[in-house]
Regions:
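Short, small-residue-biased leader/transition segments that mark boundaries at the very start
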Residues: 1-8
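Aromatic, loop-rich ligand-recognition surfaces of beta-strand-rich domains
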Residues: 16, 460-462, 494-564, 569-605
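Carbohydrate-binding/catalytic loop surfaces
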Residues: 17-32, 57-80, 118-142, 185-209
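Well-ordered alpha-helical scaffold segments within catalytic/enzyme domains
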Residues: 21-34, 80-95, 107, 133-137, ...
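Core domains of carbohydrate- and sulfate-ester-processing enzymes
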Residues: 32, 37-62, 103-118, 197, ...
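C-terminal beta-rich recognition modules with glycine/proline-rich loops and embedded aromatic residues
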Residues: 42, 101, 167-175, 180-272, ...
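Non-catalytic carbohydrate-binding regions of carbohydrate-active enzymes
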Residues: 92, 99-142, 146-201
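Short beta-strand elements bearing conserved aromatic residues within extracellular beta-rich modules
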Residues: 281, 309-311, 545-547
């Protein structure tokens, strides 16, 4: 296989991988074998992008890699390629590669990175969106992309030695990555959205099963991310109870960590063995302790708090200037030495850059490295209608028997709705938050990470409608069926902030949806908001559609007097017809020959 890679694709066919990852493997082969041909081949594959017959953004082949400065296209392919670029940059010292991967990283962390550490905003191509395009309900954030993001930041740390890369890695690890697997290890998320109305549930397997196998491979590799060694420097990058045997200057060193991190900020690092004499222990001081949500202005803390930290060696406080985010202790260590680190850990509120439209007027809540969310099992009200106080105060509640042991956050909030006269109402409630990674373990229902603090961002519970009170059935029975009558409509054809239903992967077929009313009703119009994810997705507006009603004999009949069955994107397509008294109506659609169809909402009046 490696012989083919290093000969066939150089001498006979100038081609590059359609799905990047070979570059990382080749760099690793170079490190293991010392054979230059593997590193040369990794660089060759990267160098050829932008010069082959395939020049699309989807596969990051739109321009030479050293000219790229924005994360685009399929997020998993991109992350694997960026990790390969970081490998080549570090192993060759090529400044063009170093500058390119630094530019791309700046773009991700500054404009395309979710508060949960996820990347890849849209299901349309499983891709990065535009700058600051970070929707919540439709956030894709593929589990594999989160793993790829860890790969990228780990390699950039190895290249530059700066703690900011581990700040990003840690956020991804504790939130948008481990959310991809259930607490018992038996269910998996492909996408990891930041908001839900109940259309998401972990699955035991997928037809395209990259995520389950990927995360099952990644988790056992985690011990390798805790420490790093360079010459006589030992980097302590992650905080978890462990015993590790290291080589420092070729000599054996054994360290033991004891901690309940991330639930509290106390970490003890003990020296069990040291044959290396004097070395520098570099302890990462996380960005969240230093009042930095992420190493950019994409997110900032909004509560005005200032956290602090302390470091003691054998009970005595020590001081040190931070260097690249690390607290450095240089000494001749001996067996039995103990370093006690304390990080203040309080609930914090976060706001997004105002350019992130989906998060304007909203706050997120985190404590330490953990991002929290509101979920339905802990709250006896619609969590999507929550309205946060201006300066919320949080109580931390330990729940050792809930979801394998978590901390909940509780605070006072309000629920917004409308009374019978259409006036806005606010009801005081006690809101409970749980760690984002632990959501969707107690059944399907509503969840939200970003919580409104401005009326313009709120979503008051809407009055019930005939459609919302109806029983929904469809020819394709999936979780997203709940989107059909959730009373949420898109503001335009590109709005992915509301959920949708589709018939994918069926193509060219006749499909249907039906409403069974609570009681007999007279209806005379239907409005449909079509879903179309061109150009990369597989859904297009239908060829045609019709409305049927159920007659007294229980048979479906087409409505009469229909004026127009519209198929416009981004707006409601209303058909008016002769009034009919019935217990049920049906929407029948004919899909395009080579595509599926879908819809955001179906209203009846």
């Amino acid at each position: 296989y490696t012989l083919s890679l290093t000969t066939l694709f150089r001498s006979q066919q100038i081609r590059v991988p359609g799905h990047q990852i070979a570059e990382m493997a080749l760099a690793k082969l170079y490190l293991v074998t010392g054979q230059q041909k593997y590193l040369d081949q990794a660089k060759f594959f990267l160098d050829q992008r932008g010069y082959t017959t395939r020049t699309d953004e989807y596969s990051q082949a739109h321009k030479p890699v050293v000219e790229q400065d924005e994360a685009v296209g399929h997020a998993v392919r991109a992350a694997y390629m960026y990790a390969g670029m970081a490998d080549v940059a570090a192993l060759t010292g090529d400044t063009a590669y170093i500058h390119a991967i630094d530019r791309i990283w700046d773009n991700i962390v500054g404009k395309k990175y979710y508060i949960t550490g996820g990347i890849g905003a849209t299901s349309n191509g499983e891709a990065f969106g535009k700058n600051y395009e970070l929707p919540n309900m439709s956030a894709y954030c593929e589990t594999c992309a989160a793993i790829g993001n860890v790969y990228v930041n780990y390699r950039l740390f190895l290249l530059h030695g700066e703690a900011k890369y581990y700040d990003v890695l840690e956020r991804t690890l504790y939130n948008g990555l481990i959310s991809g697997v259930s607490l018992d290890g038996g269910g998996f998320f492909y996408p990891n959205p930041l908001e839900s109305i109940g259309q998401h549930q972990r699955q035991p397997w997928f037809g395209c099963a990259c995520c389950p196998s990927n995360i099952c491979r990644f988790i056992p590799s985690l011990p390798g991310y805790v420490y790093a060694v360079k010459d006589k420097d030992v980097y302590v990058n992650l905080f978890m109870s462990n015993t590790s045997n290291l080589k420092v200057g070729g000599k054996a060193v054994s360290l033991e960590q004891t901690t309940h991190y991330p639930w509290n900020g106390d970490v003890t690092i003990g020296v069990n063995k040291n044959n290396a004499g004097q070395f520098t222990m570099k302890i990462r001081i996380p960005g969240w302790v230093r009042n930095q949500v992420v190493p950019s202005d994409l997110y900032t803390y909004s509560d005005g708090k200032r956290l602090s930290y302390t470091v003691k060696v054998n009970g005595e406080p020590v001081q040190s200037e931070l260097k690249d985010g690390y607290f450095c202790i240089d000494r001749r260590w001996k067996k039995g030495d103990k370093v006690a680190v304390h990080f203040d850990m309080e609930p914090r509120t976060v706001k997004a850059n105002n350019k992130v439209e989906a998060d304007r007027g909203r706050i997120a809540v985190e404590r330490g490295p953990i991002v929290y969310c509101a979920e339905w099992p802990d709250n006896d009200f619609d969590v999507l209608s929550v309205f946060m106080n201006r300066t919320p105060q949080f109580e931390v509640v330990e729940k050792p028997d809930l979801l394998y042991g978590i901390n909940q956050l509780k605070t006072d909030a309000q629920i917004l709705g409308y009374d019978d006269r259409g006036r806005l109402t606010a009801t005081d409630v006690k809101l409970t938050l749980i760690p984002y990674y632990a959501w969707a373990h107690r059944g399907a229902g509503a969840m939200a990470v970003w919580l409104p603090q401005e009326l313009s961002a709120s979503r008051p519970t809407m009055p019930a409608t005939l459609a919302s009170e109806s029983k929904v059935d469809a020819s394709h029975k999936v979780k997203s069926i709940s989107a059909i009558n959730d009373r949420l409509v898109p503001k335009d054809e590109n709005d992915r902030s509301v959920p949708y239903y589709h018939w994918w992967p069926k193509q060219g077929t006749t499909e249907w949806i039906s409403y069974e009313f609570p009681s007999e009703a007279t209806v005379s119009s239907a409005t449909v908001y079509w879903y179309d994810d061109a150009p990369w997705g597989g859904c297009r507006i239908p060829q045609s559609w019709k409305v049927y009603y159920k007659d007294a004999q229980g048979q479906w009949q087409p409505v009469s007097g229909a004026d127009k069955y519209g198929v416009e994107k981004g707006t409601g397509n209303t058909v008016n017809f002769d009034p009919v008294k019935t217990k049920a109506v049906k929407l029948e659609i004919v899909q395009p020959a080579d595509n599926s169809s879908g819809l955001f909402e179906w209203e009846v009046k």
